[in-house]
């Protein structure tokens, strides 16, 4: 639940340079984390911006998603929340209803809400929050636009050079190899503390 930064400006010195490199390379998406900063953390700034934000999970945190990631770092892609953040691990916003939480996530800068124990989120909750005026129109427009753009840029629609049957055959042929490679890379990336 808690994210600890005991060293002053540790985020600027150690954690955020990797994210800045990803942003500079125009990465399509970044996943926010479920944890929240401890209230007793050392002072944290990035490029002069105070990021000693609210003690809520990043998916609910406008200071981190909007002010830091988008406005200061220049991120233009979509923000995908961590899984289960809406119902089971809503750190810092436990007192809010799921309806209030989903509205807060969109208004804070989240664009895609992660799954719930492997099941897709029922977006009727977002529609209800929007119809009740809980989600700002610009937040929903931003999230929808970023979702559609990411799908279109992934070359999945209306490509006159792509035949559906050829694409499905290629996917069937390469999916097992890609899955094996992804598992191998994930295994090699683990760090034992």
How would you name each of these model-derived features?
Residues 1-193:
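Glycoside hydrolase catalytic-domain context in secreted enzymes
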